[in-house]
Amino acid sequence: MTYQFSHDDLIWKALGDARRRLIIEVLATGPKQTGDLVQLFPDIGRTGVLKHIDVLTEGGIIHVRREGRTRWNHLDPEPIRSVCNSWVAKHIDGIKSSATKLKLIAEKEQ
């Protein structure tokens, strides 16, 4: 049996790498040319950065627009917001329960 990755899985995958998170932070300040992003990572070069951009694009986190030979990268924060809100909503009851237990333990120790 083969696991089918959901769109949420693609977003979590995209967020799972420090370089991709830095690209997201940089794009949060506004669209950037691919060349500008390549300069952030001289150790992996253009090919490496393009692979990271592909992962972010696959998750819908960034959109690439071409103007002639220039590639402009734009952030779309909505997929990140959506997947995080969904995850928190799914786990909030367990988090609240753990917080309540922790509070009771702390009160007993006082």
Regions found by a protein language model. Give the residues of each.
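Short, hydrophobic-biased segments on the C-terminal half of alpha helices
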Residues: 53-54
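Amphipathic alpha-helical dimerization/coiled-coil segments
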Residues: 1-7, 25, 81-110
